Curated annotation (Swiss-Prot):
Catalytic reaction(s) noted: a ribonucleoside 5'-phosphate + H2O = a ribonucleoside + phosphate
Domain of life, per lineage: Bacteria
Name this protein carries in UniProt: 5'-nucleotidase SurE
Organism for this UniProt entry: Rhodopseudomonas palustris (strain HaA2)
Needed co-factor(s): a divalent metal cation
EC number(s) on file: 3.1.3.5
Length: 255
């Protein structure tokens, strides 16, 4: 089985080594194509106005000056053009990708691009807390990742579906189990705009994350609830985002 690994944290990110270790537990035909620079939060962006630069950094290891989407395309359509990958793994992201994170995540986008190309694809992320922020518990993803992937692959991932896996911020032996979940929703916005000023007094801005207290417990069955209870969250996500339930109502209203 030929496996293509990517991420959004960049070619030198520690989580990329973890996803490579997970891949090597499944196969010895593992290829890494990852962004030259950190691409966190770029979602499914595609480089159309700038050329892509490709650099070989080691055997079967390539850096692309582009997004995770660019990397998967370069890997599947150029580097591995002679024999396409059988599986795409994107991660392991430093930090969870749940709830609204899904629409911002470059990690998930890398896996989505693999799905668009017709390849079974998985996004993997490791949650951290304030205490483990500088040293995420990578061993949790490394210990549990291979078996989850084996079972999910055996089950047969449907076309147009990507599997989003999030590992809780606890030691491997503290994991409560595995839950198949749905995408959750936070009870309030979590992004803020910080205004600052340069040496000439001109304003500039950073988008940051609010540290907000949890008002309500996450809804049962969601990715948020699973991680809060130290379960590994496995969420099937579909490429088709059509709201079927609202379609009939909208059709009536529009005549």
């Amino acid at each position: 089985m030929r496996i293509l690994c990517t991420n959004d944290d960049g070619i030198h990110a520690p989580g990329l080594k973890i996803v490579e270790d997970i891949a090597r537990a499944l196969s010895d035909d593992v290829w890494v194509v990852a962004p030259e620079l950190d691409q966190s939060g770029v979602s499914h962006s595609l480089s159309l106005n700038d050329p892509l630069r490709l650099r070989e950094v080691g055997p079967r290891h390539f850096a692309v000056r582009g997004t995770p989407t660019d990397c998967v395309i370069m890997g599947a359509r150029h580097i591995l053009a002679d024999k396409a990958p059988d599986l795409v793994l994107s991660g392991v992201n430093r930090g969870r990708n749940v709830a609204e994170d899904v629409v911002y995540s470059g990690t998930i986008a890398g896996a989505l691009e693999g799905t668009i190309l017709g390849l079974p694809s998985f996004a993997l992320s490791q949650e951290f807390t304030l205490e483990t922020r500088n040293a995420p518990l990578w061993d949790t993803a490394k210990a549990h990742g291979p078996e989850i992937l084996r079972k999910a692959i055996k089950a047969g991932v449907p076309k147009n579906t990507v599997i989003n896996i999030n590992f809780p911020a606890c030691a491997p032996d503290e994991v409560a189990g595995v839950q198949v979940t749905r995408q959750g929703k936070r009870n309030q916005g979590f992004l803020r705009v910080d205004e600052r000023h340069d040496g000439r007094g001109n304003p500039y801005f950073w988008i940051g994350f609010e540290r907000v207290a949890v008002v309500d417990m996450p809804a049962e069955g969601t990715d948020l609830a699973a991680l809060a209870a130290k379960y590994i969250s496995v969420t099937p996500l579909r490429l088709d985002r059509t709201d079927e339930a609202f379609s009939a109502t909208l059709a009536k209203t529009l005549g």
